[in-house]
UniProtKB/Swiss-Prot annotation:
It holds the Pfam family ABC_tran. It is found in: Cell membrane. InterPro entries: AAA+_ATPase (IPR003593), ABC_carbohydrate_import_ATPase (IPR050107), ABC_transporter-like_ATP-bd (IPR003439), ABC_transporter-like_CS (IPR017871), L-arabinose_ABC_transporter (IPR053466), P-loop_NTPase (IPR027417). Keywords: ATP-binding, Cell membrane, Membrane, Nucleotide-binding, Repeat, Sugar transport, Translocase, Transport. One of its GO terms (molecular function) is ATP binding. This is L-arabinose transport ATP-binding protein AraG. It catalyses: L-arabinose(out) + ATP + H2O = L-arabinose(in) + ADP + phosphate + H(+). GO terms for cellular component: plasma membrane.
Amino acid sequence: MSEFILEMRGITKQFPGVKALDNVNFKVREGEIHALCGENGAGKSTLMKVLSGVYPYGTYDGEIVFKGEVCKFKNIKQSEQLGIVIIHQELALIPYLSIAENIFLGNERAKKGIINWNETIAQTKKLLQKVGLEESPHTLVGQLGVGKQQLVEIAKALAKDVKLLILDEPTAALNEDDSENLLNLLLELKKQGLSAIIISHKLNEITKVADSITILRDGKTIETLDMKHDEVTEDRIIRGMVGRDLTNRYPARTPKIGEVIFEVKNWTVYHPIYSERKVLDHINLSIRRGEIVGIAGLMGAGRTELAMSIFGRSYGKKISGEIWKNGVKIDVSDVSKAIANGIAYVTEDRKGNGLILMEDIRKNITLSRLGKISNHFVVDENQEIVESERFRDQFKIKTPSVFQKVEALSGGNQQKVVLSKWIFAEPDILILDEPTRGIDVGAKYEIYTIIQQLADAGKGILMISSELPEILGMCDRIYVMSEGRITGEVSREEATQEKLMRLMTKTAIQEGA
């Protein structure tokens, strides 16, 4: 029997006007963790969709050999029956069902159409123990954090007798502790004989867990690296991904910082459902003209709640405090008023809240300010095309046409469309919530350049990020949050990862001590 559990030979996949995969060869050894790297749009997800049957046999050229047998999958069910299970970046769990119901949904423990709940619960307990979860099988999935939901997804895969587990950006939405737990679980499952493919832009995680790394660029296989025998560094992986040396992760910049243009004063917000729970407690911060201000904090610190509540009170209840712009108190009591006052918010969830995926690039970009391209309440379509093409060219959005649906774009290009949409609204204050989440290093550099250009044009930038190197590399000044409070303010010159982490873990009790 071959040492390879999977061989994909000469895989070519075309879409109208685009060759997404071009004669790709990809092999995975039995019992290894194999990382798949590449820029957004390199073809990683397309290759995995070919493998799992999302793109059925006949819609691509090439051959798939799994456990020595040639496979012609017509759908996901067929690939899962052989033990190939994919966990997508957007988790496929139902929040209002229990853990047990989610794990065995479509794979029920039933006889003559009647579910055996005793067996279901017993097997769920075993699976939860295997992935390190102590929750009850009856717990609703919606009550779990994202990190634990990822573990439920893995338990669901194990319930299907998985032989090859595919993880697409498994830690993109996780904090450091949850990421560490998931990676340790993956290593433990490897010891038990599981083979895995991991797609991730977090190169430090890849080099930690992977046995082999295959790099794709522009739909082609560039190289496969063996972690034991090849000299593998993050710089080498990046060079393979982008086709050049990326000596600096962050563009060089000499900031031109002016006067204070935006202030948040004594901003307090309560939870929208649990009305006695204070989510933000007397937040005070300021942004100067041309300044990039960072917000650092662990998950649950209140960073996104702060951003959304400032942006038209789109989160929270019993909100008190004041927002000042250019020395004048402004009304941000709803989103339209926030936009009218020159505030824009780039959400952390671009697919869920930032874009209309079924619409084209043109309509997504101009949506934030239709009045700018309208005459007597009628949209001037020619002007709409001109404006959207201007942003496409300026931000190098990779697309054959502004009429292309946004859902067909890579993550990096989708993020450029979101940024274009809000820049089209001509804001003075731009709030960026995880602006490079799920984006490769090359596209990140382009996004960083756009952010710096906005600051250089005199905009005030409030940037939220869970990646401390990103905060340190991009921001002129940093506020740190913990438990809904600001626990420190650090200048760029004073900031270190250690100092930020100390402030991120500071509790109200410690502050009062």
